[in-house]
Amino acid sequence: TVKNTGSVSGKDIVELYYTAPYTKGGIEKSSVNLAGFVKTKELEPNESEELQVTFKLEDMASYDAKVNKAYVLEAGDYGISLRADAHNVIATETITVDNTIVYDENNKRSTDEEVATNKLDFAAGSFESLSRKDHFANYDAATAAPVNFSMPEEIKAVYENNSNYDPEKYNNDEDVMPVTGAKNHVMLEDVRGLDYDDPEWDLLMDELTVKEMNSLIARAGYQTTEIKSINKVRTVEADGPVAITNNFTEESTIGFPTEVTLSNTWNRELAYRFGQSMGKMADEMNISGWYGPAMNMHRAAFGGRNFEYYSEDPFIAGVMASDTVNGALEYGVYPMLKHFAFNDQEANSGWQLCTWVDEQTAREIYLKPFEMCVKNGKYCALMAANCQLGYMPAQACAPLLKDILRNEWGFRGWVITDWYSSKWYQDADRMIRNGADGMLASYDSDTNNVSDTTSATGVLAMRQASKDILYTVVNSRAYEPENLNPSMQNWVKGVIATDILILLL
């Protein structure tokens, strides 16, 4: 219960935290973690409000990247506290976990489709991670500037870019060429609302030609292309995180305060209303996809995109972004969450900026906001980041885009690249084979068109990418009946209804 004991009206925030047991040399843990929050209504002097904040036991699990290679809820006492902020405790209780719980293949977390296990070992690098052991005894070593900037020989041996990437090297002889150009008479609107794995989708995908799929993949910048054979309408997508601008018409909307300003309110209802406003404006402009919200971390105060991102705290970012996403989805506009992932530096971000990160840090901090949004919002899309994850481009990183995003989190939607400028690593073949679906280009370049259109592996990748795009589009505002048939105005519908009624009489 929150009571206003002051002399003027106001709001307050109920913040719930947990403190997990820490073993020196064991799994690294923060001393205190935000588990939930809610903001009061406007309370008059002496007015009270009763609020409830809940979370699951598994939400207190930490990721053990070294031993179990899974999320682990260690046995011990967990302090649950209401606080004014991360430091000032108002009230506390203790929960005791009698036995360690490992969320492995026999006991995955309730929100996972597949068990979470190490997928990013290749990106761990050789840096020293900061540890709580002995009161951060390794602080100087962990925060010291690097002295060696050379790429190890074993990484050079597997490093690829447009100069040495050959899609045929990765062809699978066991792949079977899919059907293309079939006449099954299934239109895209026929699969609206159907499950991603419904057999009707196979009949639809069999109808696409290689040329149609390539057009959908290669020219996905600010649009998805028309495919007349399946009655696929052209859709428009637009930037950016706090305003809508149509790149084709230059029509734009009002701009809202930055997402970090929104986060500082701790107001979930306001985040939802912000999403509604973005969705409504996009809908009124006939825009179906929104290049936002952006939810990378404020890793440093001078991050080049900090104005687009919510917070330095992954939980706050995930909660506020999820509410924003669900607000936009109310208008049938699919948010394109960006920049997935680890995009916290603008300088050289598209030119071989290699980000090295251990699995625990990746999952508990940098991936968490995206995970929360994907699991809480249906029919989303994502924009992959320009940076490298280890030695792999994030836009062509199967462990990230397939293993974690789709297999573990259960994402069903499409992934677009960041701005496509024929950089040294941007190659459509490589990207669609590793989990991306559309190239953010509105013109033809050397590498945004798929080159391997004759192998079974190549065409299967095109089919998968096309399905991901179509699944998102058909479940959006673009395929609402009034948008699909805009010529049928309300007065026409009224006349038809009247005629039917007269016939029935």
Segments (PLM) and residue ranges:
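Short beta-strand elements
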Residues: 88-110
